[in-house]
UniProtKB/Swiss-Prot annotation:
It comes from Finegoldia magna (strain ATCC 29328 / DSM 20472 / WAL 2508) (Peptostreptococcus magnus). Signal peptide: none annotated. The gene is nfo. This is Probable endonuclease 4. One of its GO terms (biological process) is base-excision repair. Keywords: DNA damage, DNA repair, Endonuclease, Hydrolase, Metal-binding, Nuclease, Zinc. Its cofactor is Zn(2+). Zn(2+) 3 binds at residues 176, 220, 222.
Amino acid sequence: MNRIGCHLSTSKGLHKTIEQCLEINADTFQFFPRNPRGSKSRLIPKKEIDKFLELRKIHNINKIVCHGAYTMNLCSDREDLRKLAVKLINEDMKKIQDMRINHYVLHPGSHKNQGIEEGLKLIVEGINKVDVSNGQMICIETMSGKGSELGCDIDQIAYIINNASIPLYVCIDTCHLFSSGIRLDNFDDYLDEFDKKIGIDKIKVIHCNDSMMPFGANKDRHEKFGKGLIGEQDLFNVIFNERLKDRPIILETPNDLDGYKIEIEEIRRNFNELRQN
């Protein structure tokens, strides 16, 4: 089945994430390269990176995902904040290159009452200043649509991808899709439209989260797997979809390591049962 893991902290050292993966039976994971609510980034010593690379090779932990800071806004109404976002993304590109990580998930941003059209243009303008010459894959995340948030429908994401001068990809988030009004019990209908307008091959990462908030609420509140208003079966409709095989599945549910281990085991068990039937 797809590689599966969760969001992990690197506060105790980048190499410690591999040990955490082994604890919870994960074969991938996601992390922040800097303070997710700010811009500060820890300088990671080469010795720590080398240890990380050694351990991930030994234990076959791959398709690791780096998630950009929440505070970066490529379509801010302030030019200084737009420039800062580009600067931080480029710094992150260099950092993940050193870690030999390709997948980078990015929230597209909020237009701050400038309007959807202007916001999308600013996102493209900023994205075009990012250096991905070493093969990094920037994955625009599907968003819930709260406030002036962009990226909450296929057409908006298609505009960004089709107008950018660098290759872009997509991370689909089950909670965000549900909250933005996408029915996951009819997920193949969504994939059909996505394939027509963007191409399913552009989907590179799956965030698997249940939702605390009701369908179409445009609010981003994650719940534990199968314990929210989406439910286990509709989440399986997404993560077990044949058209999305080989994409890393990342849990961002409100859990500690023990909770993530239980969810990962539950998902693997259901996948194996499905394969046997």
